[in-house]
């Protein structure tokens, strides 16, 4: 009661924000007359003046009134569209890093130009994020005229569809016309598109480009700039609906099967070393599960590889271009010598199954990494499986939080305001409509069966068509829209079907969905982003007249459109029919929001049945008993506010369930995200630094100190030293042949510290000899290439290990441990081990690699680039719905569901890793 009293006196927070912004609107309006008096060149010159003021120390906030006034004047002149006052408020909300909820038809695309122009003045770039490629192209070409008039450049990023990253990026150029191309969008490189002041693109492409940039081997291969400001259109769809699944770039792990088979034929020809310093090609360290080639073995292996055509004449195993061969040889040696059939693994049904060394049980679904599993498959003659390995991954939550400033706009965000605030720190501000909303949202009609419901929908469509009222029927799945389409065909009712597949065709159909008597079936996302204009799209009709239409033709088209527009208005505007409730109230509101744009009349109604998924799972028993008590007959419907409220409560449960899934995903991904930031920052510094020799020198000392300490513990006496072991590992791992035992015999006063320093000195001298041979410049290139290769290789393996850890961590709940805490602890330990391995392997490779000429450095670089771009796959799965299975692709045959994991009992720990019982967590539903 106190809260409502305070709200009556002071207004809600939303009202106070809108009222405060209204004062700035008045200041913008005061500038209008002055700007209208300027010619086009003088208006354009204002952009340069504003940039100078910003560079001189003025804030964006101080420039906002003039920048918004300039944008509005450009819109009026170039496009005949003057921003309304409420649109100015929407622009200010975007600039302040909030979400603007604006009803459908209120001109969100135009609103974005205000905040985009202001923030582009800094020269750091603005990203406008859309839900599909077509909308990115359409909006860039449409609004590009406005930006171009103000001297700003506009880029577009589209999906390349596997044709190379530079094959689908454009710059707005009013002088560009191409046969079969997109009007005024000139193809350019991706980097040029990102260098534009404002860049339009989809959330997937912005995310994938970020990941690709962090896999680049040269600075010039990176395309994005610093992530400055993003305006996310349809922000609820992108930051909520699509945020349940991460973006993943994957590729085949390891080489093709042929390489493993060829190595498999080489290894049996090598002989073991029976005793230390004795003859033989390799020595075995069973304790560490490692195999080392002797000098004789290295020469023999090189000759066998030359005979097999794997090595060129004069090329060595430790040459810069042969690192991949060395990796394969090591895997094959371990497979043949250290891993034994029926001890370490079983061969069953053409597969290698790992045996747990502690329990003796088969570890189903597990595979060894680093090419070992494939090497064992080659050894046993079973089919060699090319694994898909995650090369890079990020969730939308963590990608969009990288922007210095983030904002968004949508017609429906208020129901998810809590999540936007919790996850992204974004406040939702509801913007008032320019004209009062007059749409009639009618009560839901609930039927006993789906058959009765669909009959009622067809009857309603017939009624609307007879009175020439346009109808949009929303469905929750492709299956439902196709079923309804079949019923309409039987009833001989002409209609269009949209299934969110062909975005460009959809937009054209949706433009005409407001014609008198038009019937359109659409899934919830189909055609989103395109307004349904009553009477049809006048702009689309005028476009058919060509570039220089006759005035008489233009007048005729306008008169015809006005006649249709008035007819639809008289018949009640657009009527929305919902064929079932969606799992989220927000999606239902999106459907309703298609009608009643800009004060137009319109109506909406949902038709439900007790057999609908939402009703069946959550509300059917109570509603069914009520309907039976009322003595409902077949074909009769119940229309009651209590039923509508019960359905909304069910939707709230599903929304809470989906929020938990997203929050849970984020809590786990935050752990990986902290590590990702460290690795990507390290990688970026590597690319930007010309000379990393000092860093590598410090790393080499650090690694050698660790190795020496394993065999000569600090503060120990000489009798405790393992000199043969140290000598062996320095030679095998680092190529350092040192007579440490001889030094100790000859020099009685050789202390531990002096010995350590001498080893470091010999390592530095050996490295300097290598550098003198090829030159400092070539060595610097080799250092960067090796560092990048090792970093990337280990990071990929680390991602796979993190995936395995994540999959099994929920089981820790059985041991009364908090799975999330366990995951954080183990992930941190794994990351520390990763950094140690990277340092060791970089040092070992650089000490052993044989570089003869600058051409070797180029060969290593070419090998890296080829490996990096080979067979990449870009994946962003659609999140699974609680109520609907994902839509099957065309031509796919439905497969029966087979449970791969045991069913979760109500008293078992929840699968999500929260540590709660299933019935108290996600089992509550």
UniProtKB/Swiss-Prot annotation:
It is found in: Cell inner membrane; Cytoplasm. Keywords: ATP-binding, Cell inner membrane, Cell membrane, Cytoplasm, Membrane, Metal-binding, Nucleotide-binding, Protein transport, Translocase, Translocation, Transport, Zinc. Pfam families: P-loop_SecA (PF21090), SEC-C (PF02810), SecA_DEAD (PF07517), SecA_PP_bind (PF01043), SecA_SW (PF07516). It catalyses: ATP + H2O + cellular proteinSide 1 = ADP + phosphate + cellular proteinSide 2. The keyword Oxidoreductase does not apply. Disulfide bonds: none annotated. InterPro entries: Helicase_ATP-bd, Helicase_C-like, P-loop_NTPase, SEC_C_motif, SecA, SecA_DEAD, SecA_motor_DEAD, SecA_preprotein_X-link_dom. CDD domains: DEXDc_SecA, SF2_C_secA. Its main location: membrane. It is a peripheral membrane protein. Its cofactor is Zn(2+). The keyword Metal-binding applies. ATP binds at residues 87, 105-109, 531. Zn(2+) binds at residues 910, 912, 921-922. PROSITE patterns: SECA_MOTOR_DEAD. One of its GO terms (cellular component) is cytosol. Belongs to the SecA family. Part of the Sec protein translocase complex. Interacts with the SecYEG preprotein conducting channel. Has a central role in coupling the hydrolysis of ATP to the transfer of proteins into and across the cell membrane, serving both as a receptor for the preprotein-SecB complex and as an ATP-driven molecular motor driving the stepwise translocation of polypeptide chains across the membrane. This is Protein translocase subunit SecA. It comes from Thioalkalivibrio sulfidiphilus (strain HL-EbGR7).
């Amino acid at each position: 009661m106190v809260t409502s009293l305070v709200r009556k006196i002071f207004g809600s927070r939303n009202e106070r924000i809108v009222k405060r912004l209204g004062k700035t609107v008045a200041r913008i309006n005061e500038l209008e007359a002055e700007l209208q008096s300027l010619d086009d060149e003088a208006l354009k010159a204002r952009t340069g003046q504003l940039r100078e003021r910003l560079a001189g120390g003025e804030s964006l906030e101080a420039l906002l009134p003039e920048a918004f006034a300039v944008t509005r004047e450009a819109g009026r002149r170039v496009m005949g569209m003057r921003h309304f006052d409420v649109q100015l408020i929407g622009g200010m909300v975007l600039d302040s890093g909030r979400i603007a909820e604006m009803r459908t038809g209120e001109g969100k695309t135009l609103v974005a130009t205000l905040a985009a122009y202001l923030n582009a003045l800094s020269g750091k770039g603005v990203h406008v994020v859309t839900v599909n490629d077509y909308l990115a192209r359409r909006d860039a070409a449409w609004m590009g005229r406005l930006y171009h008039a103000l001297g700003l450049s506009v880029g577009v990023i589209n999906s390349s569809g596997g044709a190379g990253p530079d094959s689908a990026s454009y710059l707005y150029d009013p002088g560009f016309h191409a046969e079969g191309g997109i009007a005024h969008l000139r193809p350019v490189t991706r980097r040029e598109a990102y260098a534009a002041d404002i860049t339009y693109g989809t959330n997937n492409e912005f995310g994938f480009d970020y990941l690709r940039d962090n896999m680049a081997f040269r600075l010039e291969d990176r395309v994005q700039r610093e992530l400055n400001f993003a305006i996310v259109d349809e922000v609820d769809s992108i930051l909520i609906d699509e945020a349940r699944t991460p973006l993943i770039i994957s590729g085949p792990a390891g080489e093709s099967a042929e390489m493993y088979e060829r190595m498999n034929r080489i290894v049996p020809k090598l002989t073991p070393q029976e005793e230390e310093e004795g003859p033989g090609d390799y020595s075995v360290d069973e304790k560490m599960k490692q195999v080392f080639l002797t000098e004789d073995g290295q020469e023999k292996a090189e000759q066998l590889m030359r005979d097999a055509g794997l090595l060129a004449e004069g090329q060595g195993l430790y040459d810069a271009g042969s690192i991949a061969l060395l990796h394969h040889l090591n895997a094959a040696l371990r497979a043949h010598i250290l891993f034994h059939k029926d001890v370490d693994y079983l061969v069953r049904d053409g597969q290698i199954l790992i045996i747990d060394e502690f329990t003796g049980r088969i570890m189903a679904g597990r595979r060894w990494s680093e090419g070992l599993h494939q090497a064992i498959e080659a050894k046993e003659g079973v089919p060699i499986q090319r694994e898909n390995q995650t090369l890079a991954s990020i969730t939308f939550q963590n990608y969009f939080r990288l922007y210095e400033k983030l904002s968004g706009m949508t017609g429906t965000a208020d129901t998810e305001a809590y999540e936007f605030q919790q996850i992204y720190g974004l406040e939702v501000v509801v913007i008032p409509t320019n004209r009062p909303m007059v749409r009639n949202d009618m009560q839901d009609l609930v039927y006993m069966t789906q058959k009765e419901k669909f009959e009622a929908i067809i009857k309603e469509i017939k009624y609307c068509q007879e009175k020439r009222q346009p109808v949009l029927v929303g469905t929750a799945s492709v299956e439902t829209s196709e079923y309804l389409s079949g019923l309409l065909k039987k009833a001989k009712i002409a209609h269009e079907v949209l299934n969110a597949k062909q975005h460009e065709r959809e937009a054209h159909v949706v433009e005409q969905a407001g014609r008198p008597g038009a019937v359109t079936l659409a899934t919830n996302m189909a055609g989103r982003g395109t307004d349904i204009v009553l009477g049809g799209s006048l702009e689309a009709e005028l476009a058919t007249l060509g570039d220089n239409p006759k005035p008489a033709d233009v007048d005729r088209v306008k008169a015809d459109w006005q006649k249709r527009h008035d007819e639809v208005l008289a018949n009640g505007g657009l009527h929305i029919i919902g064929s079932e409730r969606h799992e989220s109230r927000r999606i239902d509101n999106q459907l309703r929001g298609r009608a009643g744009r800009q004060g137009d009349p319109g109506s909406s109604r949902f038709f439900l049945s007790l057999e609908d998924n939402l009703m069946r799972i959550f509300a059917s028993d109570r509603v069914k008993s009520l309907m039976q008590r009322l003595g409902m007959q077949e074909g009769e419907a119940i229309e009651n506010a209590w039923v509508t409220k019960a359905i909304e409560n069910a939707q709230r449960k599903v929304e809470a369930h989906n929020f938990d899934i997203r929050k849970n995903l984020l809590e786990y991904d935050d752990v990986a995200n902290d590590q990702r930031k460290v690795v990507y920052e390290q990688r970026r510094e590597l690319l930007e630094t010309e000379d990393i020799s000092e860093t590598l020198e410090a790393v080499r000392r650090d690694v050698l100190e660790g190795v020496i300490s394993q065999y000569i513990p600090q503060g120990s006496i000489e009798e405790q030293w393992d000199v043969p072991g140290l000598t062996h590992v320095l030679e095998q791992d680092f190529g350092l042949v040192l007579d440490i035992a001889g030094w100790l015999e000859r020099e009685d006063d050789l202390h531990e510290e002096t010995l350590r320093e001498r080893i470091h000195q010999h390592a530095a001298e050996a490295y300097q000899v290598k550098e003198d041979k090829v030159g400092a410049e070539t060595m610097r290139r080799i250092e960067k290439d090796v560092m990048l290769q090792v970093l990337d290789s280990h990071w990929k393996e680390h991602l796979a290990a993190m995936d395995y850890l994540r999959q099994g961590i929920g089981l820790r709940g059985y041991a009364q441990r908090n799975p999330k805490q366990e995951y954080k602890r183990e992930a941190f330990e794994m990351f520390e081990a990763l950094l140690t391995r990277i340092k060791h392997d970089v040092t070992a490779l650089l000490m052993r690699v044989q570089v003869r000429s600058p051409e070797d450095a180029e060969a290593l670089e070419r090998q890296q680039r080829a490996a990096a771009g080979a067979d990449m796959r870009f994946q962003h799965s659609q999140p699974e719905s609680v109520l609907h299975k994902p839509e099957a692709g065309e031509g796919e045959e439905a497969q029966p569901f087979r449970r791969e994991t045991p069913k979760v009992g109500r008293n078992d720990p929840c699968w999500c890793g929260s540590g709660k019982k299933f019935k108290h967590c996600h089992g509550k539903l």
